[in-house]
Regions:
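Acidic, polar-rich N-terminal leader regions of halophilic archaeal proteins
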Residues: 1-201
Length: 201
């Protein structure tokens, strides 16, 4: 049985009460090793169990008070798992930022099956950008981050590449930088801290 990745727990604790259901699924999908689209439902449950144990242990040590940094995690295992089930969309296309997807039976993903079918396991960042710009109805409209322009906000791009490409964000970022240096990718020159990435025309 695969070991659970401590980076998931660390990132979840850091986010605390602001951690959203879809963000936790994406964290698991990004950090837990896997070679197929999405994460096994049992693996998601194991992480929920671990976070629940972590929360109960922390609550006991602080007697119900705030964490040392002034925040409280308040993770509810059962509510999280119920929310995962409720958000599963029976579709292969993008259904909004709150949706989760089942790219295969008993597997959960932050992104639709069609994205995995087209790009699963790839780290060709230009291919990702073109796909996200041209083949994902509604996705760009749902993004709240990024500067002006018609490209993909870099942080969002790194999320998609790391999850669908089944790699780490450092590798994804290195691929973006390589694409810029090669002239395959450009950024809109609006000086926004998260400028949008697009293919060179």
């Amino acid at each position: 049985m695969a070991e659970l990745n401590e980076d998931v727990f660390a990132a979840a604790r850091q986010r605390g009460r602001t951690l959203l259901t879809e963000e936790l699924v994406a964290l698991i999908e990004r950090h837990h090793p896997h070679d197929r689209p999405g994460i096994e439902r049992d693996i998601v449950t194991r992480y929920a169990d671990g976070l629940d144990t972590d929360e109960r242990s922390s609550s006991s040590s602080r007697d119900g008070g705030p964490d040392d940094d002034g925040t409280s995690f308040d993770f509810d295992r059962d509510a999280f798992l119920d929310e995962v089930d409720a958000r599963l969309a029976d579709t292969e296309t993008w259904q909004g930022t709150d949706a989760l997807y089942a790219p295969e039976d008993d597997r959960v993903s932050r992104y639709p099956a069609r994205w995995h079918d087209a790009l699963g396991g790839s780290t060709d960042v230009r291919e990702f950008v073109v796909f996200l710009l041209e083949e994902t109805d509604g996705y760009l409209d749902d993004l709240e981050s990024g500067g002006a322009g018609r490209g993909i906000p870099e942080d969002e791009l790194l999320d998609v590449v790391s999850v669908v490409g089944r790699t780490d964000r450092e590798t994804a970022k290195a691929r973006v930088e390589s694409g810029r240096k090669a002239g395959d990718l450009v950024e809109d020159a609006d000086q926004h801290p998260e400028a949008r990435v697009r293919p060179r025309e």
